[in-house]
Swiss-Prot record:
GO CC field: ribonucleoprotein complex; ribosome
Source species taxonomy: Archaea, Methanobacteriati, Methanobacteriota, Methanomada group, Methanococci
Keywords: Ribonucleoprotein, Ribosomal protein
Name of the protein this chain belongs to: Large ribosomal subunit protein uL16
Signal peptide: none
PANTHER family registered for this protein in UniProt: 60S RIBOSOMAL PROTEIN L10
GO biological process: translation
Length: 173
């Protein structure tokens, strides 16, 4: 069955559902790496992607955002010239009550009886003002990090802002 649109899951009004021991099978998050680049160096400039609203971000959106941003920053800075860090983890379990459609579906489907649903994915619960992604670079690569975060934000279902949290005085305009 096809993947439902993100609008079905993006609100945070529902109560958190994270208890894996009650769920028969939770799908693994698609996010492969949370820290990329050179983690042994302390970079003088740190730029963060910050959420502007409360939202659930699905694991496949986080993964596509990671790929887009990491690909760009690696091309600009090389393998050891940056530190890329995803700051959220998809703990929330997303459920779907699959409904049969078409001829004879009423005989097969249970409708809303036992409508709890099966786990179809995971999502990260992000609050307004929370950091989603952090990139550490040298001052001369600041604009590359900013562009990488802009590309990351295009893949996420919320409006984001880019904030310099460390080394603002080192950046030359």
């Amino acid at each position: 069955m096809a993947l439902r649109p993100a609008r079905c899951y993006r609100t945070t009004e529902r109560r958190s559902y994270t208890r894996k021991e009650y769920v028969r099978a939770v799908p693994q998050p698609k996010v492969v790496h949370y820290v990329m680049g050179n983690s042994s160096v302390e970079f003088p400039v740190e730029v963060q992607l910050v959420s502007k609203s409360d939202i659930l971000i699905r694991h496949n959106a986080l993964e596509s955002s990671r790929i887009a941003g990491n690909k760009y920053i690696m091309g600009e800075c090389g393998r050891t010239g940056y530190l890329f860090n995803i700051r959220v983890y998809p703990h929330e379990i997303l459920r779907e009550n699959k409904m049969a459609a078409g001829a004879g579906a009423d005989r097969i489907s249970d409708g809303m009886r036992l409508s709890f649903g099966k786990a179809v994915g995971t999502a990260a619960k992000v609050k307004k003002g929370q950091e989603i992604i952090t990139i550490g670079v040298n001052p001369e690569r600041f604009y590359a990090a900013k562009e990488a975060l802009r590309r990351c934000s295009m893949k996420l279902p919320t409006a984001c802002k880019i904030v310099v949290t460390k080394g603002k005085e080192l950046i030359k305009d």
